[in-house]
Amino acid sequence: MAKIKKVRYFTKERKALISKENRKKYDKYLNSNIIKNRDVKDTTYKVYSNYMDQFLVYLAEKWSNIDLYSEEFMEDAVDIMEGYISFCQDVLFNNKKVINTKLSTVSSFYLWSLKRGYIDKHPFDKKLDRMKGANEEKIINSYYLDDEQMNLITETLKTDPKFDIQDKLIWSIMLDSANRIGAISKLTIQALDLENMVFNDIREKRGYKVEVAFNDYSKELILEWLEMRKEMDNLEVDSLFITKYGGEYRQMSKGTIQDRVTKIGEILGLDDFHAHCIRKTALNDIYVKTGDLSLAAEMGNHKSVETTRSSYIKPQTKAEVRQKIIKMKQKMQESKKKD
């Protein structure tokens, strides 16, 4: 699969072009929503704010900073949005799923504005088609590791000096818990329950609180790491994973954790290994070894087993399905003979 093409388009200079009036309108909407759901201020709303900035830069450059509430915008909204879709495709090289999210970001602003009485109608509601096939579009590679590959990583992390104890912990806890990287980045010493081998009340996607469970080996690593931390920051930083910046220890960012995961993937010769691959590997491994899809869904904090089935279980080849059918038939025949 081809590498994802990254474009740095939205520089400080371009963002400075955004109309102050348009910025003021969106900030009012954003603050209103943050008040209702502060838990996702630095996650979901940060993404939406960034996407809206991109749209406002587009308006500044292509539509002379047209006012978001102006009659001209209302009249030309469909043309504006279709042009923005083309811009996202041709200039930013966004995939379909990202483009749909960007459209939803703008649409949500107008839905709020309509409820508040700032406008009389939504300018493009039901007039635009969402990008089709977004869910089927493969954006990044997914790797489902087998036992041999998982063991190779675990053993290499123990012996290769270029990896440290935090690398071991990230790999081990992610594999044990099958949690998202967002939860892993928020692990704290205060939330740690060593006796029950779990981190409690960790805020994850959209502010939901989850548990992050781990096994015996991870427990050993955590104990070792906490002893080391006494000599580093005397456990003053509550975050489990830390980095040193400007002479001070602070919480390790999600981006730094992902960089470490990418480095771990190089053990297997994978240069595009990402945190979600570990999550998928863990959940798929549960299903393969237990045959219980609901158990995998529960571990993944999924509300529906269909989410687990469609996105976290390794698709079987026709040959694998055939072999499975043959084995099932053989078992049925053996059972009949015994009867």
Predicted regions mapped to residue ranges:
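Basic, Lys/Arg- and aromatic-enriched nucleic-acid-binding interface segment
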Residues: 151-181
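C-terminal catalytic core of tyrosine-transesterase DNA break-rejoin enzymes
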Residues: 172, 279-302
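C-terminal catalytic core of Y-nucleophile DNA break-rejoin enzymes
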Residues: 204-224, 237-260
